[in-house]
Amino acid sequence: MSSNPARLFVIAAPSGAGKTTLVKLLLERNPGLEFSVSYTTREKRKTEVDGRDYFFVDKERFLELKEDGELLESAQVFGNHYGTGRSQVEQHLEKGNHVILEIDWQGARQVRESMPDCVSIFILPPAREELERRLKDRGTDSDEVIARRLQEAEGDMTHWDEFDFVIVNDDLDIAVGELEAVVDGKGDANRSSSPELRQKLESILV
């Protein structure tokens, strides 16, 4: 990984784009990176661990954190609250470590306002049909919830041009390699301003 000064990398994506899997692989391959664990009020899934995947708290505790200014950003998604602890991020950066923050586009917008020096990355699926397949393959949601998530995801994807970089998660190995390149300061091919990338996105965002 790069020896560049510590940066905060904000990674967002529509539901089902493979963001969580990409971030997991990135962290496994680069143990020097720090993962910012977010707070949430949603129910813990069977495979999740408190303090590793999220800090699971009730609504009252979440609102206390928000009121006390302890959250760098917060958002409400599908009726659940999500937020990033400010002190955790700042401590990692002060130690000289890159920090990876996995959130939604709303939270990313707030983080950019609070920390303009952050690097923002948006993950896209290769096609709408692939997004729908991935959501169904999770096996955790009803058809009604999947339909709602798909509709929400389509709206989320319209915000891609707010981000510094865009990665299309078609091939997992290629996508994580592109993510590593961005963190390493060598991801120019994935800049959202790239004409070649914009042309590629036209076929996805129709």
Where are the model-predicted features located?
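ATP-dependent small-molecule kinase phosphotransfer cores
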Residues: 38-99, 105-109
